[in-house]
């Protein structure tokens, strides 16, 4: 059973498996703590033998932790987390991301969005995988405190507009200054790569 469980956990490093299972791995004390706070932590994986026998804790050897971890020198703790529902929940301040490909950029954008009070993020299908280890690390836990959906923007934007959300996009050509835009209660901002 143990070997099978480890094999299944290693498979979570693969996007296809993450999508099929609705699960993903996070590395390190901070990320595990943030996942727990958000109620998304299903299983803690640790090399700390003093945790043996605790509920929802799997104690593994250092060599197994190295197989599971994304980093060369893993921290002694990881977690298996479940993905949130892919449903729009908040309409007051929405950040729409169109084609963001760089994992570090996506993570930084998500951290900034949380800092600026956004609760809802919409990602186009061609954005980098949200559960890519580099994205998760660069969010520093912000990913656990945002509602994030992946959907076709040609469906989402008209739906938001029907709900009275003003949609504002960045553009290099024929654009108005951000200073000229009047703030409304419901706004969505579109950013590209």
Give the predicted meaning of each segment:
Residues 49-56, 86-90, 181:
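Short loop/helix-cap segments at secondary-structure boundaries that form the rim of catalytic
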Residues 29, 46-51, 83-84, 172-173:
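Short, polar loop motifs at secondary-structure junctions
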Residues 64-102:
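Hydrophobic alpha-helical segments and helix pairs
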Residues 3-48, 127-128:
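Boundary-proximal intrinsically disordered activation/regulatory segments immediately upstream
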Residues 53-64, 185-187:
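Active-site regions of enzymes building and remodeling cell-envelope glycoconjugates
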Residues 169-193:
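Active-site/ligand-binding-proximal alpha/beta "capping" segment
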Residues 88-175:
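RNA substrate-binding interface of SAM-dependent RNA methyltransferases
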Residues 47, 59-61, 80, 124, ...:
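Generic beta-sheet signal
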């Amino acid at each position: 059973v143990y070997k099978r469980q480890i094999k299944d956990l290693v498979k979570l490093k693969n996007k296809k498996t993450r999508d099929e299972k609705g699960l993903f791995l996070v590395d390190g004390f901070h990320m595990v703590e943030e996942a727990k706070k958000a109620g998304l932590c299903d299983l803690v994986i640790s090399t700390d033998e003093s945790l043996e026998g605790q509920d929802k804790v799997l104690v593994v050897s250092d060599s197994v932790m190295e197989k599971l971890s994304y980093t060369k020198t893993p921290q002694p703790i990881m977690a298996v987390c479940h993905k949130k529902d892919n449903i729009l929940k908040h309409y007051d301040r929405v950040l729409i991301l169109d084609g963001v490909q760089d994992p570090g950029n996506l993570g930084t954008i998500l951290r900034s969005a949380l800092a600026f009070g956004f609760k809802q993020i919409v990602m186009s299908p061609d954005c980098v995988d949200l559960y890519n280890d580099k994205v998760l690390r660069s969010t520093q836990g912000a990913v656990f405190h945002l509602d994030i959906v992946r959907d076709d923007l040609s469906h989402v934007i008209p739906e938001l507009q029907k709900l009275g959300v003003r949609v504002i996009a960045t553009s290099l050509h024929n654009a108005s200054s951000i200073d000229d835009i009047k703030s409304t209660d419901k706004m969505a901002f579109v950013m590209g790569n």
